[in-house]
Amino acid sequence: MKKDSAEVGFINKANYQTGSNRDYTNAAMEKKKPSLLLHACCGPCSTACVERVVQDFEVTLFFYNPNITDKNEYLLRKETLLQFVNAYNAEHKDEFTVNFIEGEYDVQRWLDRTDSLKDEPEGGARCDICFAMRLTETARQAKKLEFDYFTTTMSVSPHKNYDKIKTLGMILEDEYGISYLDIDFKKKNGFARSVEMSKQYGLYRQGFCGCEYAKLAQEAKRENDR
């Protein structure tokens, strides 16, 4: 199966490196804040990420996660994200609005790209393909909908390699001609803050990343730890 060129580039350019000297801190000083399409992997991860960027950007969360192959789990995570968005907007209604859009739930496309890698360990080649598929679609939608920037909440997880995410983001920036927001959300205690905010908003926190393979691996680990 032919893969998107960015997916191929991400895999083949493991040593691709590029620096970013852009300063985003003055964005809020401009008359109109730049727009950001923020790929949201789930509600809990989105909390601290939204808090981090919402003062400087017009934020729209993009829920595109075909890796969540269990439909009930997918719907639960979407509803959890909307639970947070609605509560956060209500709290800050006089300051800003965080928007939400949902991507296509194309599970079969995700399975076609990852089936041969189902035995890969967490963080391996299967995850690389998964990152690439989701962030590529985010960049594509950001270009189509004329956003100024795109990025993802995935970097808030301590289990996600930001160098890989950034490399992919910069490749996609070149390919789509739209700016990748270079930000590692796990820094400045981002993950701890996401846990704190999830408790504050009473959000469901899942015990695995998303795909069935990761779920089985987590279940096996829990069984071995008993």
What do these predicted regions represent?
Residues 2-51, 56-226:
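Nucleotide-activated chemistry modules centered on ATP-dependent adenylation/adenylyltransferase
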